[in-house]
């Protein structure tokens, strides 16, 4: 979404001074690869903070690329401990437009933060659907 709207990426975050390696270790099993890798700080009052209700949460980390410059119209929702953008949304969007860098779908039923995110997405889908006419 960031690139499509005019933003840019770091192609190899691990090679950027000041950033740690966000890639998974392929020698580990899937549970370990997708396990919590680091914490992210949620922007107070932001969409993600309102959904989760906490200042920070642990997330998995399996990515080599990362946001470099955020596109105009996007808002940072969370950052990693090294300052890398881990989540963003579209400012003043009429619907649910949250992008995250981690994999909240992994073992979702065991992760209350992921459950809250997907619950908010589902509620937004239902709200959108309720505004549309149904075929007769």
Feature-to-residue mapping (PLM):
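Post-Walker A helix-loop "phosphate-sensing" segment adjacent to the P-loop in P-loop NTPases
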Residues: 6-11
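Amide-donor transfer/coupling interface in amidating biosynthetic enzymes
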Residues: 14, 18-136
